[in-house]
A protein has these predicted regions:
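Short, flexible beta-strand-to-coil junctions
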Residues: 40-46, 163-167, 509-512
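Extended helical coiled-coil dimerization/tether regions that scaffold
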Residues: 117-186, 236, 249-257, 264, ...
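Switch/communication elements of ASCE P-loop NTPase nucleotide-binding domains
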Residues: 170-233, 341-473
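RecA-like P-loop NTPase motor core
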Residues: 284-327, 332, 402, 419-422, ...
Length: 516
C-alpha cells in the first residue's frame, strides 16, 4: 500500500485512488510526544474510508524527540517503527475493508496488535508507555484489539468471584461474592449490585476490591482476593483497569493516586470529591471545591472530544437527556462543538455551572467514565443514588451499562436503593446483611428487573420496612382500633391505596389470631 503523510490541516486530494493518507494530528501527550495521526484509505474506485486515530512510535527515540521520523511517503514502515490504533473501532473499520486490505495495512504500519512479539519489544520504549498507551491498556492490545485485528469478536464472557478478608481473630468464613457476565444477554448482565441497609459493610467491600486489584503491597488477609477467568485472562490479571466512583463526603477510604505510565500493571482512576496524597502538614487534602470539580470537568470534556471517545460521549449524553433538565440544557450539544480548546472548555464549564449539584455529579461522572473506561475495566460505584432522583438514577444506570458493553467492562454498584435493582436481573444482585461481625450475602428470591419498587423494598429489607415509617404507624393504629373505618378516620382519610391494603391485611391477620 502506498502511504503519504500530510501536514496538520491538509486534506487528501479529491482524485486519490488505491492509497492511504496519514493526517498529522498535533495532539500532545504530557508535553513530551506528538505521535497521533488519522488514517484515511482510498480504494481503487476512489471511495474514501476514515479508519480512525493511530499513534506511531519509534525504537530508540532521542531525548526531546517528540514525533517519530517517519518518511513523507512509503510503502511499508521499516523495522524502526511500530503503530497502535487508539480504539477498537479503528480495527473494526479496517475489518470493514475486508481481510486482504486489513492485513496489508496492519502489516505495512507495523501494528503491534497484529504482532505480539513486536508489542513486547515496543513495551520497553518510553514512548509506548507515555504516548501510545495513554488512552489504551496493554490488555486491550493483547485482548480485544488482537481479536478484532484477526476478524474476531469484541466482547468477552466473565466469571469471577471476590472473597472478603476474614474478620480478625475469627473462625467465621468471609463472605464470597460471585459474578458472571454473558455477552449480548437481555437484560444486560454487565452491572452487578450489592444492596443492603446502612452499616452492613457495602463500602468496605468495594474498598477491599479496590485494594485487592491495585494495592501495591496488599495482602489477601487484609483486603480479600479475586478469583476467576475471562476469555482473555492475561498475566494472571482478571481486569486491566479499575475505576472507583464515590461522591460521599464521609467516605473513610482515601483514593489511590492515578498513574501516567500505563505500560504495566492494573490501571486505576478515581472519580469523586477526595484527592489522593497528603498535604504539606501531613494530613489528607481537603475535598475538591465546586471550582475544582468544574476544572476537572473542563479537562475531561476536552479529552472526550478526541477520537472514538467522542461518539461514546455523545451517546452517553443523549441517553442522559431522558432527564428533562439535561435535555433543556442541551448537554449533548457539547459533543458536537468544534470550538478551540480554550473556548470549548469555557463553554463546558459555563454549562456545568448552571446545573444542580445532582446533575453536575451525573454529568461529571459520566464524562470521566467515558474518559477512563477501557477494555476489561471494572467500575466500582458507591451509592450513586445519594445525589440523584429516581428517573435520573435510572438514566445514569442505563448509560453506564451501555458504556460498559461498548468497552467490554463490568460494573459493581453498592446501594440501598431498589430503583437500582429495577435495572438488573436477580442473577446480578447480592443482598448483603450483617450479624455482629459476620457479613452474609444471598440472591433475591424474586426477579428484580422491572419489578415494582415497593415489592423490591420488602424483598430486600423485609421486617425493617414493617418496623419503621408509615408501616409502624398503621400497625399501631390497627392495634388500638376496632375496625377498618376507625383506622381510616384516625388518619383523616389521607391514605394511599397501599396503606389501605396494608390496614385490611393487618386487621385480617389480627382477626385470625383472635379466632385461634
Amino acid at each position: 500500500m502506498y502511504f503519504r503523510v500530510l501536514d496538520h490541516g491538509v486534506r487528501p486530494p479529491a482524485d486519490a485512488r488505491a492509497r492511504a493518507y496519514l493526517l498529522t494530528d498535533n495532539w500532545d501527550d504530557w508535553f513530551k510526544y506528538n505521535t497521533m495521526y488519522t488514517l484515511v484509505v482510498y480504494n481503487e474506485e476512489g471511495a474514501s474510508h476514515s479508519i480512525g486515530s493511530v499513534k506511531i512510535g519509534q525504537f530508540g527515540m532521542e531525548e526531546g524527540q517528540r514525533r517519530p521520523a517517519i518518511p513523507k511517503t512509503f510503502d511499508t514502515l521499516n523495522d524502526r517503527f511500530f503503530s497502535l490504533g487508539q480504539d477498537d473501532s479503528y480495527y473494526e473499520e479496517l475489518n470493514a475493508l475486508g481481510p486482504e486490505y486489513r492485513d496489508r495495512l496492519l502489516r505495512d504500519l507495523k501494528d503491534v496488535a497484529l504482532d505480539t512479539e513486536l508489542f513486547q519489544r515496543a513495551l520497553k520504549e518510553k514512548v509506548t508507555g507515555v504516548s501510545l498507551l495513554r488512552a489504551v491498556t496493554p490488555a486491550s492490545v493483547q485482548g480485544q484489539f488482537y481479536r478484532i485485528a484477526r476478524g474476531g469478536t469484541r466482547l468477552s464472557r466473565y466469571k469471577f468471584s471476590y472473597t472478603a478478608p476474614k474478620p480478625p481473630r475469627s473462625r467465621i468464613n468471609p463472605v464470597r461474592l460471585e459474578f458472571a457476565v454473558k455477552p449480548e444477554s437481555q437484560p444486560p448482565t454487565n452491572i452487578h449490585v450489592l444492596i443492603g441497609r446502612n452499616g452492613v459493610g457495602k463500602t468496605r467491600l468495594l474498598n477491599g476490591m479496590t485494594r485487592a486489584l491495585v494495592g501495591a503491597a496488599a495482602e489477601d488477609e487484609d483486603v480479600g482476593s479475586f478469583e476467576g477467568e475471562t476469555e482473555d485472562l492475561l498475566d494472571d490479571r482478571l481486569f486491566a483497569n479499575l475505576v472507583s466512583v464515590t461522591f460521599s463526603a464521609f467516605d473513610p477510604f482515601g483514593p489511590l493516586p492515578d498513574r501516567q505510565d500505563k505500560s504495566s500493571g492494573v490501571q486505576y482512576a478515581y472519580i469523586g470529591l477526595r484527592r489522593s496524597g497528603l498535604g504539606e502538614d501531613g494530613e489528607p487534602h481537603p475535598p475538591r471545591t465546586p471550582d475544582q470539580l468544574s476544572s476537572v470537568f473542563g479537562r475531561s470534556v476536552w479529552l472526550c472530544r478526541q477520537g472514538a471517545r467522542a461518539s461514546r460521549w455523545r451517546r452517553a449524553l443523549e441517553m442522559l437527556e431522558a432527564d428533562p433538565i439535561f435535555k433543556d440544557a442541551e448537554v449533548a450539544s457539547l459533543a458536537g462543538n468544534d470550538l478551540p480548546e480554550k473556548e470549548f472548555r469555557a463553554r463546558a464549564r459555563t454549562l456545568f455551572s448552571k446545573l444542580s449539584s445532582g446533575h453536575k455529579i451525573v454529568l461529571l461522572t459520566m464524562t470521566r467514565l467515558v474518559e477512563t473506561v477501557e477494555e476489561r475495566t471494572l467500575v466500582l460505584l458507591d451509592e450513586p443514588e445519594a445525589h440523584l432522583h429516581p428517573p435520573l438514577l435510572s438514566a445514569f444506570i442505563r448509560a453506564l451499562s451501555d458504556l460498559l458493553i461498548n468497552r467490554n467492562g463490568v460494573g459493581i454498584i453498592a446501594t440501598h436503593s431498589p430503583v437500582v435493582l429495577q435495572e438488573v436481573p436477580k442473577s446480578c444482585v447480592w443482598k448483603v446483611r450483617r450479624t455482629n461481625i459476620r457479613v452474609e450475602a444471598d440472591r433475591p428470591e424474586i426477579e428484580t428487573f422491572g419489578e415494582n419498587v415497593g415489592i423490591l423494598t420488602r424483598e430486600v429489607f423485609g421486617l425493617e420496612v414493617t418496623d419503621s415509617g408509615f408501616h409502624k404507624m398503621l400497625r399501631d393504629a390497627v392495634s388500638d382500633s376496632v375496625g377498618y373505618g376507625e383506622v381510616v378516620d384516625r388518619f383523616g382519610g389521607e391514605l394511599g391505596g397501599e396503606a389501605k391494603a396494608i390496614i385490611r391485611a393487618l386487621i385480617a391477620a389480627q382477626s385470625a389470631g383472635d379466632d385461634d
